[in-house]
Amino acid sequence: MTKDRVAQWIRPEIQRLSAYRVADAADLIKLDAMENPYTWSPELIEAWLERLRQVSVNRYPDPQARSLKLRLRQYLALPEDMEMILGNGSDELIQMVLLAVAGPGRSVVAPEPTFVMYRQIAALLGLQYQGVALREDFSLDLPAMLQVIRERVPAVVFIAYPNNPTGNLFSAEELQAIIEASPGLVIVDEAYSVFAGETFMPRLEDYDHLLVMRTLSKIGLAGLRLGMLMGNPAWIKELEKVRLPYNINQLTQVSAEFALEQPGGLDEQARLICKARAQLQRALQQLPGIQVYPSDANFILFRTPPHQAEAIFTAIKERGVLIKNLSGQGGLLTDCLRVTVGTADENHAFLKALKAGRKN
């Protein structure tokens, strides 16, 4: 009877979905989730803990996170006349946006493959989602994108810049054409911009329907779950109406502000990751049968020989390293695996496991 009652009351589109699953990484070198591999020094950790000791966790946090926002505006060089809304990770910001625009016949457009949460949250909210296939080299099919925008008149267009899971950076001219052709919101998701050196932040003043999304997850603060969405105040004002109160907790606000007081350390970590990325790309390119794709992010997508991705992924995991198997998604990602750029030791362990796994 319980199963029947659940089926009766849970929306059919929810029942058709699968819950987001995270692989168990216990006792493994974790190179599957695009996390920053570096931690703080013992001295910095002690200073951070001292700051946390002063937090009154019996009180609700500042609902507007005003002090943190001021620090973020400086760090991100947000134009003075633009506004910002914070989310419990970028996922919550995506949900806020789609909650605000959802309605009968409304649609969402994004190139694919891309960040899976665009599609998943759109489906959760009953929006029509239209993915536009990238070309075989994962470049943007601009004519196809523009045609779909004309036909579907989307409420929101998402562009990951650089793209996830492919790692490449679409051209600024292509994004500009998409922005100018779009009738609704365009959200440029810059989760990995710190590794690419490119941003649409200065263009917020040029387009009143452009929002730029960032996160602190890729610069070593994934555990805080903090995302930022920035743009024209008129949009932010409406999105504030769907934001749950106190969504950014006390510890996240204090910890993020503390981290942003040491920007040199964050920038140095990004520089180290970019250097390690280039070294890892060169090493992968030397392996016969492995096709390596360009990356402007903190991960590398590579293609295995046909029908070998699952076996290679399993062999690497058996040797103590967890990466991401994307082959099961099919389409352009068939035979593809993705590895996060780790420390020198982690990257060495991955390459050793990959070489050994390919021989079996």
From Swiss-Prot:
Could you tell me the EC number(s) of this protein? 2.6.1.9
Q: Name one Pfam family in it.
A: Aminotran_1_2
What the entry lists under InterPro entries is as follows: Aminotransferase_I/II_large, HisP_aminotrans, PyrdxlP-dep_Trfase, PyrdxlP-dep_Trfase_major, PyrdxlP-dep_Trfase_small
Q: Which GO terms describe its biological process?
A: L-histidine biosynthetic process
Which Gene3D superfamilies does the UniProt entry name for this protein?
Answer: Aspartate Aminotransferase, domain 1, Type I PLP-dependent aspartate aminotransferase-like (Major domain)
Q: What cofactor is this protein dependent on? A: pyridoxal 5'-phosphate
Reaction catalyzed: L-histidinol phosphate + 2-oxoglutarate = 3-(imidazol-4-yl)-2-oxopropyl phosphate + L-glutamate
Listed pathway(s): Amino-acid biosynthesis; L-histidine biosynthesis; L-histidine from 5-phospho-alpha-D-ribose 1-diphosphate: step 7/9
Alphabetically sorted, this entry's keywords are: Amino-acid biosynthesis, Aminotransferase, Histidine biosynthesis, Pyridoxal phosphate, Transferase
Give the sites modified to N6-(pyridoxal phosphate)lysine.
K218
Which CDD domains does the annotation name?
Answer: AAT_like
- Provide a Gene Ontology MF annotation, just one: pyridoxal phosphate binding
Family that this chain belongs to = Belongs to the class-II pyridoxal-phosphate-dependent aminotransferase family. Histidinol-phosphate aminotransferase subfamily.
Assembly and binders = Homodimer.
Q: What is this protein called?
A: Histidinol-phosphate aminotransferase 2
Lineage of this protein's species?
Answer: Bacteria, Pseudomonadati, Pseudomonadota, Gammaproteobacteria, Chromatiales
Primary gene name: hisC2
